[in-house]
Regions:
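GST-like fold's C-terminal all-alpha helical module
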Residues: 122, 127-136, 140-149
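Acidic, low-complexity terminal tails and accessory targeting/binding regions
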Residues: 1-4, 84-92, 139-141, 158-234, ...
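Phosphate-coordination/substrate-recognition cap region in phosphate-metabolizing enzymes
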Residues: 39-102, 209-282
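Short N-terminal binding/cap micro-motifs at the start of the first secondary-structure element
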Residues: 15-18, 224-226
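Short glycine/proline- and acidic residue-enriched helix-loop micro-motifs
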Residues: 101-121
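Generic beta-sheet signal
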Residues: 6, 141-150, 214, 245-252
């Protein structure tokens, strides 16, 4: 049986991230906060053994990769989507200048964003890069890839069969968030999603729910026999109806949380599996009128 593990790391905060403007293949450097995030990442990654380390050739990813202190290959295939004329604009400016494109984006219609790349072009590029990486790893091999939010999210959406959804159920990548996948022949296991617990609280980027959203913190308790929050599903429905724009905490056994994570991702192929989170672990789920989104799902580091 072939077993491989790949850890994807979104780059640390860039100057464009801090300014709240679109960045695609423009080469925005790391911000002061981003450099501090790299230090936090270094403490977690520096003693981890990897058979292969790759980064996008854009400086915000390449400079984040320096946290490993080892030789890291640079590969253009791992670049962010090219957003063309959207580059350097705020969201409000994009909505004002390209209203038709924003509608097409929400409806998941194929078009070249800002005259740059289309999402199907990015999917093909990301899938090809991942296939090439897997082909280079030895049996039991581990790789780490420093790349971009759009690339990581598009790979995950492809694996769970949700590329036509808006928003993607496993999206909204945090700076230096780690997403780890284990490949066992045709089966894929999600070991961690968007894990930034290596950062101090002041360097993390908590999601602030909009008035039409509820942020649900899912805490793992006991085994299947432990009921956790009484009537788990009703608690989430009640939160959605009464706590809009707020945060609610619920608890459940690890099996139920893994099932909820899988349900959030939609009709997941049988070969994709969410591993069950450990006792005391907290995950985050965003609920709105649209498709729910899993913001955070992390497990202890698992060696293979």
């Amino acid at each position: 049986m072939s077993v491989l593990e790949v850890c994807f790391v979104r780059h640390a905060q860039s100057v464009s991230n801090a300014a709240g403007i679109w960045q695609g293949q423009g080469d925005s450097p790391l911000s002061e906060m981003g450099r501090a995030q790299v230090e936090g990442l270094t403490r977690t990654l520096r003693d981890q053994p990897y058979d292969l380390a790759i980064s996008s050739d854009l400086s915000r990813a390449a400079d984040t990769a320096k946290s490993l202190g080892i030789n890291v290959e640079q590969d253009r295939a791992w670049r962010e989507i090219d957003v063309g004329e959207w580059e350097g604009l705020t969201m409000d400016e994009v909505i004002e200048r390209f209203p038709e494109q924003m509608v097409a984006l929400r409806e998941r219609r194929t078009f070249e964003i800002g005259g740059g790349e289309s999402w199907p072009e990015v999917f093909a590029r990301a899938d090809g890069a991942l296939a090439a990486l897997r082909g280079r790893l030895p049996e039991g091999g581990r790789a780490i890839v420093f790349t971009h939010g759009g690339i990581i999210a598009s790979i995950l959406a492809g694996l769970v069969g949700a590329r036509d959804a808006f928003p993607w159920p496993l999206g909204r990548m945090r700076n230096t968030g780690r997403t780890t996948l284990r490949f066992q022949d045709e089966r894929v296991e999600l070991l961690a999603h968007n894990d930034d617990r290596h950062l101090n609280e002041e360097l993390r980027q908590p999601y602030e729910p909009r008035p039409d959203q509820v942020l649900v913190r899912l805490s793992t308790v006991g085994e299947a026999s432990d009921p956790g929050t009484t009537d788990f599903n009703s608690a989430i429905k009640s939160a959605r109806n009464t706590s809009a724009g707020g945060v609610v905490s619920v608890s459940a056994a690890s099996q139920r949380i893994a099932k909820l994570a899988q349900d959030t991702a939609g009709t997941v192929p049988s070969e994709f599996r969410f591993l069950e989170p450990p006792l005391g672990h907290t995950s985050e789920l965003l609920i709105s009128d649209g498709q729910p989104m899993l913001l955070d799902y992390a497990l202890p580091s698992i060696q293979i």
